[in-house]
Amino acid sequence: MAHVRNKKSDDKKAMVVAKEDTNKSESEGVTKLQTYLKTIPIAKKKFAKLPKRKKSPTSAELLLIDPRYSASKEGPLGLGPIVLPFVQRFNNIDGFMTLYVAAVLIHGALFAVVDMTLNIYQVQFSLTRTEWYLMDFSDYIASFVVAIIIAHFGSKGNRTRWIAASCILMGLESMLFAFPFFTYEIIIPGRQSIELCMEENEKRNIICGNSVPNRSKCIYFHIAGQCIHGIAGMPIYILGITFIFDHIPTSSCGFYLAIGHSAYLIGYLLGMVGGLQNFQPPPKEKTVEIEPAKVYQLLQSGWWKTFLIIAAISFCVSFMMVCFPTSLPGAHKLRLAKRKEPPTIDRRLKDMKIQPHLKGFLHNIWHILKNPLMLTQAICKVSEYLTFNTSLYFLPHHLQTQFLITPGIASLLTGAFVLPGGIIGHFLGGLIVDRLEMTNKNKLKFTLVTTVVSVGLFLLIFFVECQTTTFAGINEDYDGYGQLGNLTADCNEYCDCTTSLYTSICGRDEKEYFSPCFAGCKATKVSQTEKTYYNCSCIKEGLAASDDEGQFIDAIAGTCDSDCLKLPLFFAFYFSATVFSNMCSIPVISIILQSVPANFTSLSLGVTYAIVKFVASVPAPLLFRLSSAIACIYWDNNRCGGKERCWIYNKNILVYEFMGIWMSSQLIIVLLNIYAIQIHDVVVHGEITESKTTVKDVKEQKERKA
């Protein structure tokens, strides 16, 4: 019995131990299961029929569940299932920046080459104002239309694929621009670059308006290409910038943004250098080998080859760009680290999220526009654009009137100083912000200081001036045989000269003439690397020097020497002013990105670029056109009866217009940044409300004591 009892007790103990082991294993299993369930995203917990939390999520939770910042979006570098291990070293922000800079360079270079082809169309087709406006500004109009739409929908998906699509569009538009130069006759061969006073001038063929073959087709192709160009730029400058901002620490954003923005101007400069090569005349050996009717193909071959090269590079960049994932490795961790940084956004936007429906979308745009920090910096971006384009538009005219430089050289000098000044300004501004790790308020102060310095340097250039030379037909009446404001006089009336060719010459009488034809010159040759002119009927005074063959020289190519040595000083001041005026660009962009929540960055940039492109497409062209009309003294009236361009300006009026528009744009930046500095703490922290309450409490305490 005792043995049986002991056996039963042992069995009972064994059952208890087994039960305890079973409970222990079950508890461990539950513990493991609970630990495993905690790693499942919230979206998948619904399928486990777990109770839903009725409490509304906080802004931090909204940020974590946003699929754009989810760690699950971080993937390898590859094309779908094709993932190569040895290329994963490029799956970082530096690898993306390499391709991004290439895309921006292509966009800038294409913009420069298109501007040059527009000048060809203007000369060859005698464009009307409406045609010229549509061909020049249709890209801005297209950008204005699609900027906010691309910012809204592009931020929800894979932004690198949007940029890859932009590269494909740039390739397609390059082919559109190349097609007219490959197919149609645009550049008419045999046109004189320097016109002399000859009887043949009366017999030349004059083709006007729609009588030019394939004129309308070329214009339509150009406008279509410009529209695609404007659309292609928005994903690059909106989604690309936000992608960079999301994958770098806030303290380092200035350096990366500076590289991206400087690349656009570098691309434009490279496009100018490459496009100028196409203006060089082909060798005589090649022109002799082909038929005269096909000479235009040789003249135009450089242009369509340039466009096709750009298209090939664009397609290559798009193929590599599409391999990047939605988020680079480490993006989610970086986003969590940014949450711990001091607040910089408008406190009213703290818990907002983008609504999917139209009403909510418009409501979000309205709230962004109500953000004073974002709105002031968006207007600063507009003013920065006006400042830069004022330089590009007015500086060549100022150099022509003030320093008597020919239009071609004035345009080259403008590009040689303004574009590098903009590049250096963009890069220095971003580098200084990056190295000093400025807060938003300090960035506002930095923008204010650099703008004030640029205004001071700009004022100095107007103390640099030269004496105006005598110009026949403009401020001199051909020794009494002509009228002021009329280039035609008795001495050149029979020459039938055209004002479409502005090739100024300096006569031995120390007077400047619009062209050899208006000086009545009948012969020319190159003497000691200098073009000289002979038998000029309008030049009757002055000492005549002889050339190597004993013939008396009446005039030489170029403007008359005014003994003005102040041009280097002028460019020193102007280059410095350009650098300082562009140093505010990167701080402005970074403030726009940091003054809104992370899920609003693309939309805020979209609103900013929509404002900039609208001003660039409507008010700015009207302003520049009106100011040009007011200051113009002599227009180019073509043989078809239309005004094409202004050749000569009133010096004083042009200076006042140049100074007024440039300084007004900079002063707007100064005033807006002073205002933004004053309200920064209020917008971010809400200190005015607290201070008002404190003052009220102090008054109540004084009244109680009284």
Curated annotation (Swiss-Prot):
Residues 1-24 are annotated as: Disordered. PROSITE patterns: KAZAL_2. Its main location: membrane. Residues 119-130, 181-218, 278-301, 397-410, 467-565, 625-652 are extracellular. Keywords: Cell membrane, Cell projection, Cilium, Disulfide bond, Flagellum, Glycoprotein, Membrane, Transmembrane, Transmembrane helix, Transport. The chain crosses the membrane at residues 95-118, 131-151, 160-180, 219-241, 254-277, 302-324, 375-396, 411-432, 446-466, 566-589, 605-624, 653-675. GO terms for molecular function: organic anion transmembrane transporter activity. One of its GO terms (biological process) is organic anion transport. It is a multi-pass membrane protein. Residues 7-24 have a biased composition (Basic and acidic residues). Auxiliary component of the CatSper complex, a complex involved in sperm cell hyperactivation. Component of the CatSper complex or CatSpermasome composed of the core pore-forming members CATSPER1, CATSPER2, CATSPER3 and CATSPER4 as well as auxiliary members CATSPERB, CATSPERG2, CATSPERD, CATSPERE, CATSPERZ, C2CD6/CATSPERT, SLCO6C1, TMEM249, TMEM262 and EFCAB9. HSPA1 may be an additional auxiliary complex member. The core complex members CATSPER1, CATSPER2, CATSPER3 and CATSPER4 form a heterotetrameric channel. This is Solute carrier organic anion transporter family member 6C1. The lineage of its organism: Eukaryota, Metazoa, Chordata, Craniata, Vertebrata.
